[in-house]
UniProtKB/Swiss-Prot annotation:
Belongs to the MnmA/TRMU family. The lineage of its organism: Bacteria, Pseudomonadati, Campylobacterota, Epsilonproteobacteria, Campylobacterales. Residues 138-140, 293-294 are annotated as: Interaction with tRNA. ATP binds at residues 6-13, 32, 116. It comes from the Bacteria. The gene is mnmA. One of its GO terms (cellular component) is cytoplasm. It catalyses: S-sulfanyl-L-cysteinyl-[protein] + uridine(34) in tRNA + AH2 + ATP = 2-thiouridine(34) in tRNA + L-cysteinyl-[protein] + A + AMP + diphosphate + H(+). The keyword Nucleotide-binding applies. GO terms for biological process: tRNA wobble position uridine thiolation. Keywords: ATP-binding, Cytoplasm, Disulfide bond, Nucleotide-binding, RNA-binding, Transferase, tRNA processing, tRNA-binding. It is found in: Cytoplasm. GO terms for molecular function: ATP binding; tRNA binding; tRNA-uridine 2-sulfurtransferase activity. Its EC number is 2.8.1.13. This is tRNA-specific 2-thiouridylase MnmA.
Amino acid sequence: MKIAVLLSGGVDSSYSAYSLKEQGHELVGIYLKLHASEKKHDLYIKNAQKACEFLGIPLEVLDFQKDFKSAVYDEFISAYEEGQTPNPCALCNPLMKFGLALDHALKLGCEKIATGHYARVKEIDKVSYIQEAVDKTKDQSYFLYALEHEVIAKLVFPLGDLLKKDIKPLALNAMPFLGTLETYKESQEICFVEKSYIDTLKKHVEVEKEGVVKNLQGEVIGTHKGYMQYTIGKRKGFNIKGALEPHFVVGIDAKKNELIVGKKEDLATHSLKAKNKSLTKDFKDGEYFIKARYRSVPAKAFVSLRDEVIEVEFEEPFYGVAKGQALVVYKDDILLGGGVIV
């Protein structure tokens, strides 16, 4: 089978390509220029080229920087301006990697596209679904909720059945040169955030704009450094007059540049809604497991679809729900889709 492999210049994607080559597939390497300095792109392309030379496969470089900026990066900035906590990876996957890049791969005659994502594809009754990775600590299925069945059927995740801790030893044994590659240490999960998301925002908007902090009764009880520097659940970085116990951000009013704070129990949510829904075609109202943050433990909830809006009623209180984050629905370890929390 002819498969396109997205190569980032790192160990995971390189080993993904190696494992597919060992299985006898015909491969085409693809490097995506999305958002980084030219210096970084040059290094990553050089690393990807070394992997391709080792495997004896071609490498194509696709420049999607303009598309990425308008569809993902600018949306990230806008969401924070609106007081939300966005999830750019959940946007990038369907639009860039499994959108534009997949389209290009199909034009090259490839039947499928592979990445180093920690996830799996499972076929149930001839329909392809995303399944959680074996390594639950590194599972990335959460970011793939917006993919259609027809797209999922064209995906390959060679690392989905492996543990993250085993990848590097396996890769170095198979491809010794990987241990000598120069690289940049990424400090954030978001590819275009080099130091902190606040530093990224500062390049485009006024972040340090002091405002007031109010309690749930609407009383002014302190000050903050600028609403975009805070997310739901944060308990530091603002001043509360005479505070004797911890206060947490429970609400953000972007238009007024105000924070609303409360006690930890005030972070509890019993229900929520999500828009821009992307659910499996056979979805039915019922009890499922929910993730409302990437690192959150799946929570039991009753999920229903009302006029294109996903409505969730949690079995137990869920803490720290932020507007703009992805709400993802699972049946056991099978991904059924999700939406954006409103």
